[in-house]
Amino acid sequence: MAAVDSFYLLYREIARSCNCYMEALALVGAWYTARKSITVICDFYSLIRLHFIPRLGSRADLIKQYGRWAVVSGATDGIGRAYAEELASRGLNIILISRNEEKLQVVAKDIADTYKVETGIIVADFSSGREIYLPIREALKDKDIGILVNNVGVFYPYPQYFTQLSEDKLWDIINVNIAAASLMVHVVLPGMVERKKGAIVTISSGSCCKPTPQLAAFSASKAYLDHFSRALQYEYASKGIFVQSLIPFYVATSMTAPSSFLHRCSWLVPSPKVYAHHAVSTLGISKRTTGYWSHSIQFLFAQYMPEWLWVWGANILNRSLRKEALSCTA
């Protein structure tokens, strides 16, 4: 009995001495919970403010804000074409850049006839190196370029391990995904700075959020574009230039064509037209956005999840996409 009493007294003394530490830990826990809760609430408020509230009012006058002409690279299909059409629907004249002259002529005529705007084309293969940029610079030098959309990009044929990627494809990813955006900005930015207005939209990818296995070179190139855009915004915001890093997740383009699963999830994987309509409405509002409401939800989950969980999910998804793509080519 004496032993029980002694243990009870010892327990009370220890509990009393630890009480202040327990209270401190409780305060830390309460502070952490409150901080995380406020962050989540603010993130969802930002999502609503960005993707839903602007749609209730009138559309922004992009010509007045930025200028009369927009340049869109990789503009003959997918997000690039849809983005060009959306800008044209708002009255901007469009200069389309791509490597296929026949497709460029068709798209330019469609846009001009549908939206009653001026269009121009520049034939350029961004994978061919530095020599293409002098003709582009000459073609654009007398234009009031208000918006540049860096959309041109190269994707993997399907998700695969780095050593399975051909050397030619790797060079294309570097030249097109990284060099093209950087040099196109170098071409148009001086004119924007001189006029003290302009917007640069660079299309990155949701795969830049965290290391993405089986898309290693592609996701790294898109991470470059994201950081490049954010740094430019800090450099040139004071000069009247708006720079946006656009971070889409999957959109129903030719890049996702082999996957029947992705094309079934239309609310997660919008069409290029739907995506571009939403994305253009964020121009001038958000410097870094996914451009589409369901992609913003995916981005929030990606931000909060640990890296190991992202990698695990990416491996499962990319293995499935590779298997489906290979079965289509078999």
Swiss-Prot record:
Q: Which SUPFAM superfamilies match?
A: NAD(P)-binding Rossmann-fold domains (SSF51735)
Family per similarity comment: Belongs to the short-chain dehydrogenases/reductases (SDR) family. 17-beta-HSD 3 subfamily.
Name of the featured protein: Inactive hydroxysteroid dehydrogenase-like protein 1
Question: Where is the protein localized?
Answer: Mitochondrion
* InterPro entries in the cross-refs: 17-beta-HSD3-like (IPR052149), NAD(P)-bd_dom_sf (IPR036291), SDR_fam (IPR002347)
Q: How does it assemble?
A: Interacts with STYXL1.
So where does this one cross the membrane? none
Amino acids binding NADP(+): G74, A75, T76, D77, G78, I79, G80, D125, K222
Biological classification of the source: Eukaryota, Metazoa, Chordata, Craniata, Vertebrata
The record's annotation in Pfam families points to: adh_short
Give the GO cellular component terms, alphabetically: intermediate filament cytoskeleton; mitochondrion
Source organism of the structure: Pongo abelii (Sumatran orangutan)
